[in-house]
Amino acid sequence: SANAKIAEGFLCDANGPANGKDASGVEFSCTKGGDGKYSWRSKQTSNSGSGSSIFSLGALGSKCSKEGEIGWNGLLVAACKSGVVKYALVSDVPATPASGYTSRPTWYPTLTQILGGPSGIEPTCSPSTIKFTKPVIALDKLAPSIPYGMMVSDHVTPIDHAYLGVISLAIPQASRTANDYIAVTAPADGVITELSSLGSPSSHRVVINHGCNIYSVYMVLNKATGVLADSFSKLSNNGFMSLSIPIKAGEEFGRQRDNMLDFNIFDGTQWLSGFANPYSYLTQDTWKPYTADYLPLFTDDIRAGMEKQLQRTSAPRIGKIDQDVIGAAAGNWFLAGTNGYGGNLTSAYENTTVQVPGGSVSGKNTYAWSHLAIARHEVDTSKWILSTGWYKDSKGDPVQFLINLTAGQVAPDKLTASSGAMVYTLSQFSYIFPAGTPARVDGSSEPYPVGYTLGSGTSVGSVILQVNSDNSLSIEFASTFTSDKRTYKR
């Protein structure tokens, strides 16, 4: 029955009914969480009324009395405008300080608000009390791993997670058996709060709350097993499960064989200072500024084993995703007229009283169509990558190119308004393996070796960049600006 699909935490259709009742008659609202997904939340916690005893602002469209007030309403950052709760726009929040934010601005939601749900309780203990005493992948099963910050396909901006390699990837796909699956285990005690499908029978997401503001996240997990076996057997019916399953350090919750395992840590007490405009991440991936280095959490022996397999050999070994240089070309950019990471036009947020769906943009091939990043490569940090969601197709055709700096040419992190327009040549890039690297097995998908570097490949033409006096960036894939010039903002 339809009611069977309505339950706390189950996914709902953003374009379907806004309210519903479960089999017991409890009322739920279809609400958007900080992860961009819509799920059923009880009306007692979804803050669907005109006010709230927990949050200063109510739901979109409800009445408010404190003009200009900005705050979290349980689902999003809102503002009181002319007595009505509306989306907070970038013009409503304070401008980023010249030196950037070194800690969370008061208007930005906490990690607990983002990942803990509307009824989440802020922890009072310190993250320093959490220690990862078990590996996620047994060290003898771990293969070379990609650090934070890769730019690939429609992951246009540097990715906020690592990819842990597994030795089964060295086996040709056609030769892999059930015995080649490798256990994925919890690094510390915690509570599994989410199991969801990423759209494929062999790709899942798991979130573990370790307490004290530390969360670990795992994606493209091939199988959910162990303590998640029962939940996994029911997952196909709804695609998303909000859970509360205790797990101990070293306890298995999944198996991996056919791809690298996405892994990262969020720490609600840390803040990445290298984002020039944190507001841009309110529309999707709101957790991004809380991305933290997982290496210090592990015991020394496990840390050493994981570091040994990280492809990047320069500090920080885990990589860096926040590469914005205020006043220069380096870092993340979003097409002028769009509202940050979500990819929708700002106009979609201005007067709406319903939540703007996340994860896709109507009429576009990808939400990242409006993204642009000019950042150092995640492994070979001597090389600069231009990553764009819109190359030739305005609907979105994400691609990454190597920027070939010539002698005396200003690097992107030094390209400022005073530099004027700068033309860079772009090329495909090749991978150069360290001497003595064994030949790759045909049909395998083993990760590239630790310490590889990039070489310049086939030329793809030029790009012209100019930082403007208002700190926006003009770009065109040509050697001179024409009417096709685009402008991006932070």
Label the model's feature ranges:
Residues 100-204, 212, 224, 248-249, ...:
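Surface-exposed, glycine-biased beta-strand/turn segments
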Residues 219-244:
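Aromatic/His-enriched, Gly/Pro-containing loop or helix-boundary segments
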Residues 13, 65, 72, 185, ...:
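Hydrophobic beta-strand signal
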Residues 57, 183-186, 240, 246:
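Residue-level "contact hotspot" at macromolecular interaction interfaces
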Residues 261-280:
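Short, compositionally biased
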Residues 370-490:
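Contiguous, well-ordered beta-strand patches that form the walls/edges
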Residues 204-207, 244-267:
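Short hydrophobic beta/alpha edge segments that flank linear recognition/processing sites
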Residues 3-99:
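Tryptophan-rich substrate-binding surfaces of secreted polymer-degrading and adhesive proteins
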